[in-house]
């Protein structure tokens, strides 16, 4: 059902085009890590306002950044087979519509965080939005094969934002959650870049495999996976998580490591996509284990 009218040109636009702009699957994972950050920052139950308004504000700001990414990348998206059906290159939406939609989400999200959560969370969320939508998308993505390593800081912010939404401050445990997502980001995106290498070459985007080749990138994926496995043990070592979390970190990390060893040894596009997809399961599972390990005694009234 088409239910949004765009006055310019009288073109009917499906509401799903606007939803697509927000990259909802990415935002869901980001907000989930933010919620885990909230629970880990709380000695008992998370304050209701922080959980609801904070999560919504972070989600709206993330959706705004994603829409700006669509706007900045419309030329690249039109070239790449994976993205040419997105709302802008397909002609379903116009740049001004996307800019207006993104601005609305951004103002709403940041306003909610500033008014009902705390200024620190609003400021960090704004910095993350600018870092992803402008610094990464407009500059780093086109300037260096280390784009995702440097720009990954913006995408790693949600668990830190969740923490500050509850406490109003940053501490070492919050930065540790940030570090996990930060180290996870390069192997996640490099696997996709290997699988879609021809697309990135056509679009002239200097992703790591475009500049240094597949073999080098597969090695980097493996090395970062080893680093990620080590970093993922730090919550257990610092008593943020217990034995349940440790079992999940070792199990999920071991499987991810084995998959990326196979990725190094086996040519072809099938394993890069498997690695990319499993990395999402890995991050969700790791943070879910942290949440359950910390909150299970509270939920059981122990």
From Swiss-Prot:
Gene3D superfamilies: UbiA prenyltransferase (1.10.357.140). One of its GO terms (cellular component) is plasma membrane. Its EC number is 2.5.1.141. It is found in: Cell inner membrane. Signal peptide: none annotated. GO terms for biological process: heme O biosynthetic process. Keywords: Cell inner membrane, Cell membrane, Heme biosynthesis, Membrane, Transferase, Transmembrane, Transmembrane helix. Pathway: Porphyrin-containing compound metabolism; heme O biosynthesis; heme O from protoheme: step 1/1. It catalyses: heme b + (2E,6E)-farnesyl diphosphate + H2O = Fe(II)-heme o + diphosphate. GO terms for molecular function: protoheme IX farnesyltransferase activity. CDD domains: PT_UbiA_Cox10. The chain crosses the membrane at residues 26-46, 48-68, 98-118, 120-140, 148-168, 174-194, 221-241, 244-264, 280-300. It is a multi-pass membrane protein. InterPro entries: Protohaem_IX_farnesylTrfase (IPR006369), UbiA_prenyltransferase (IPR000537), UbiA_prenylTrfase_CS (IPR030470), UbiA_sf (IPR044878). Carbon 2 of the heme B porphyrin ring is defined according to the Fischer nomenclature. Converts heme B (protoheme IX) to heme O by substitution of the vinyl group on carbon 2 of heme B porphyrin ring with a hydroxyethyl farnesyl side group. HAMAP family: CyoE_CtaB. Belongs to the UbiA prenyltransferase family. Protoheme IX farnesyltransferase subfamily. PANTHER family: 4-HYDROXYBENZOATE SOLANESYLTRANSFERASE, PROTOHEME IX FARNESYLTRANSFERASE, MITOCHONDRIAL. NCBIfam families: cyoE_ctaB, PRK04375.1-2. This is Protoheme IX farnesyltransferase. It comes from Alkalilimnicola ehrlichii (strain ATCC BAA-1101 / DSM 17681 / MLHE-1).
């Amino acid at each position: 059902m088409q239910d949004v009218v765009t006055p310019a040109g009288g073109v009917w636009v499906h509401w799903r085009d606007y939803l697509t702009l927000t990259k909802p699957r990415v935002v869901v994972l980001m907000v989930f890590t933010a919620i885990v950050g909230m629970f880990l920052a709380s000695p008992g139950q998370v304050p209701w306002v922080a959980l609801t308004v904070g999560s919504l504000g972070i989600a709206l700001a993330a959706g705004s950044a994603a829409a700006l990414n669509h706007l900045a990348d419309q030329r690249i998206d039109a070239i790449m087979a994976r993205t040419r059906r997105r709302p802008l290159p397909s002609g379903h939406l116009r740049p001004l519509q996307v800019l207006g939609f993104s601005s609305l989400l951004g103002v709403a999200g940041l306003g909610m965080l500033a008014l009902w959560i705390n200024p620190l969370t609003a400021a960090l969320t704004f910095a993350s939005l600018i870092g992803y939508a402008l610094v990464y998308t407009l500059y780093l993505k086109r300037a260096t094969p280390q784009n995702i390593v440097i720009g990954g800081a913006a995408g790693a912010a949600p668990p830190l934002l969740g923490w500050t939404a509850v406490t109003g401050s940053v501490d070492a445990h919050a930065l540790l959650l940030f570090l996990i997502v930060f180290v996870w980001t390069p192997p996640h995106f490099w696997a996709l870049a290997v699988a879609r290498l021809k697309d990135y070459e056509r679009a002239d985007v200097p992703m790591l495999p475009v500049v240094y080749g597949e073999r080098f990138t597969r090695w980097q994926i493996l090395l970062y996976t080893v680093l990620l496995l080590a970093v993922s043990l730090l919550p257990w070592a610092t008593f943020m998580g217990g034995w349940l979390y440790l079992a999940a970190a070792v199990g999920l990390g071991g499987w991810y490591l084995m998959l990326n060893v196979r990725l190094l040894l086996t040519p072809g596009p099938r394993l890069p996509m498997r690695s990319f997809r499993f990395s999402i399961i890995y991050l969700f599972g790791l943070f879910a284990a942290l949440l359950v390990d910390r909150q299970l005694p509270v939920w059981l009234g122990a």
